[in-house]
Amino acid sequence: SLSIDVTSLPSISSSVYKNESFSTTSTISGKSIGRSEQYISPDAEAFNKYMLSKSPEDIGPSDSASNDPLTSFSIRSNAVKTNADAGVSMDSSAQSRPSSDIGYDQMDFSLNKGIKIDATVDSSISISTTSKKEKSKQENKNKYKKCYPKIEAESDSDDYVLDDSDSDDGKCKNCKYKKKYFALRLRMKQVAMQLIKDL
C-alpha cells in the first residue's frame, strides 16, 4: 500500500492579510471533499501597488478581478497552508472531517489499494550463448574427426591425401606438387609420431 500524507508541511503565512475566512464542503462523484479556504481581502494599497508594478503586457487572465477584485491576488499570494483537520479523502465517500475556523488550505490523501507489486518472477528461461553457425561448425568437426584415419606412416596414400573430399573443387588430383606434398606429409607424420612416443 502507498500512503501519502502532506499534513507535516510547514505553514506559510503572509502578514498583509487579515484572518477572515470561510469553509466550503462539496461532494463530487461520491467522494467527500472538505476544504477550509482563505479568501482574504488585503488593503487596497497592496493590490494597487501589485497591479501598477506590472506592465500592461504582463497582465493576463490570472490577474482578473471581475468577480471579486482581490480574490485572484489573495489566493496566489497566500501560498500553501496546512492543517490536520481539513483535507480531501480519496478512499472513502461521505467521510466527515472536523472543520476549523483557522484560515488553512490543506490536502491529505492515502491510496490503500493503489499499487500492488508482485516481485516473484518465474525463472524458467534457458539462455544458449552458442550461435547456430558455431553449432554447425562443431557438428562438422565431429563428423570429420570420425572420418580421420589413425596417425600411421602407412596411411599416407592416395586414399587419404588429396582426394575429392579434401579439396573444394576436386582439381588438386593432378597438382604438380603432389609428390613433394606426400614426402613432406610423411616426414611430418614421423616427427609427430616420435614426439608422441617421447611424451
Swiss-Prot record:
Q: Please give the biological process terms from Gene Ontology that the record holds.
A: viral genome replication
Question: Phosphoserine modification sites?
Answer: S66, S155, S157, S165, S167
Q: Where is this region: Disordered?
A: 52-71, 85-105
Localization, per the record, is: Host cytoplasm
Task: Write out the PTM section of this UniProt entry.
Answer: O-glycosylated.
- Write down the InterPro entries for this protein, in alphabetical order: Rotavirus_A/C_NSP5 (IPR002512)
Which regions are flagged for Polar residues bias? 90-99
Q: Which GO terms describe its molecular function?
A: ATP hydrolysis activity; magnesium ion binding; nucleotide binding; RNA binding
HAMAP family in alphabetical order: ROTA_NSP5 (MF_04092)
Q: How does it assemble?
A: Homodimer. Interacts with VP1. Interacts with VP2. Interacts with NSP2; this interaction leads to up-regulation of NSP5 hyperphosphorylation and formation of virus factories. Interacts with NSP6.
- What this protein is called in its record is Non-structural protein 5
Source organism = Rotavirus A (strain RVA/Human/Japan/KUN/1980/G2P1B[4])
